[in-house]
Amino acid sequence: MKRLTVIVKGWPRLSETFVAQELVGLEALDLELDLWSLRHPTDTRRHALHLQLKARVRYLPEYLWQEPGRVARGIGAAFRLPGWRAAFAAFLRDWRRDPTPNRGRRFGQACVLAAEMDPATAHLYAHFIHTPGSVARYAAILRGLGWSASAHAKDIWTTPAWEKAEKLADMAWCTTCTAAGADHLNALVPGKTHLVYHGLDLSRWPAPAEARAPRDGTDAQDPVQIVSVGRLVAKKGYDDLIAALGRLDKNTAWRLVHIGGGPLKASLQAQAAAAGIADRIDWRGAQDQNHVRAALAAGDLFVLASRVAADGDRDGLPNVLMEAASQGLALVATDVAAIPEFVAEACGVLVPPGDPASLATALQSLIGDPTARARLGTAAQSRVQRDFPFARGREALYQLLHPCLSPPTPL
């Protein structure tokens, strides 16, 4: 079997555990991978999963001016490839509709990739159809290879329709991790996109060894532990969560543990201070998977207040919901994007997005009812175990990839 070249936007990324889980899982099925990243890492921590990847990891020039010699050699080599004329024509068509430095950078990166990728490469596979998809597409045309992609969330909802449609028509197949995303993409190019849930590798998420204490919010010395994990960006709705927490009964004992970094941290901390709840929130920043698992295991309740951002960005199906469910936590989340595909009535509470009052009502009710939390948490744990196993999604992806990498059967 030949090699698969995988293109990602950044590696490693703490917020994209689903990518690491998938690639390590594919290697376990004996696929030979080369990983190319458009960006260098910005996270100072890594998940254990990142260290388990055996593939070579290489970084394309993040900005073309940073490595002018390498870029010049890449363009020169790409110019001599049989696919140059077709690839450059595709780039020019895109440039006319998107004349941005970002578009030019992706073509330059594609030239470097096409020049430097392993000659044994049989197929290219991009995680996210926006910028990684552009690099994969141009490089595939240059080398005369097939390509495919996995679409997720922001890339689906913020990429122009013309670009998505042309990429889908050009690629062998696409996968996406939500039914909402699959419906949207298949409306553009029917039959090209497959629904493949990431699922959760439960061997990495064992259930907590000890039962939770029945905290009910009446003991200030032992408050109910609310946990939320997510980047501090608009689509995660943390301003709505803080507004909801500020509405809770002042005599209710609760504490929020938040894990994740992001550009809105200072404004959210100021909002919490203005609401008089700053001393109840533990902002832990970006953490590796071991710390996330420990926080979830120690928690009583998980909350995620996602919404659609002004630019159309939104969540897909956040993996952290499955991670919280694996730890037997009751879930409070918003009825937006693909969240309802996992959070059913029996295993959690859904509230309208952008509605702090409804969110506060749901939190107040569950903080004071440990029996309901236990019932919902048990149901959530059963749902992830039964309906979202990692092996199922990995096998579906393998069945798509394998024909792209295997030599044709002799007639």
Tell what function each PLM region has.
Residues 286-288, 294-299:
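Short alpha-helical donor nucleotide-sugar binding micro-motif in glycosyltransferases
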Residues 321, 326, 330-333, 343:
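Short hydrophobic beta-strand element within catalytic cores of glycosyltransferases
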Residues 345-356, 365-371:
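Conserved acidic donor-binding segment of nucleotide-sugar-dependent glycosyltransferases
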Residues 160-163, 186, 200-218, 222:
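Acidic anion/phosphate-binding donor-loop and adjacent secondary structure
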Residues 297-312, 329:
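Acidic donor-binding loop of glycosyltransferase active sites
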Residues 180, 199:
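Carbohydrate-associated surface elements
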Residues 115, 220-232, 238, 242-283, ...:
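A conserved nucleotide-sugar
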Residues 280, 358, 365, 372-387, ...:
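A short, well-ordered alpha-helix in the C-terminal region of glycosyltransferases
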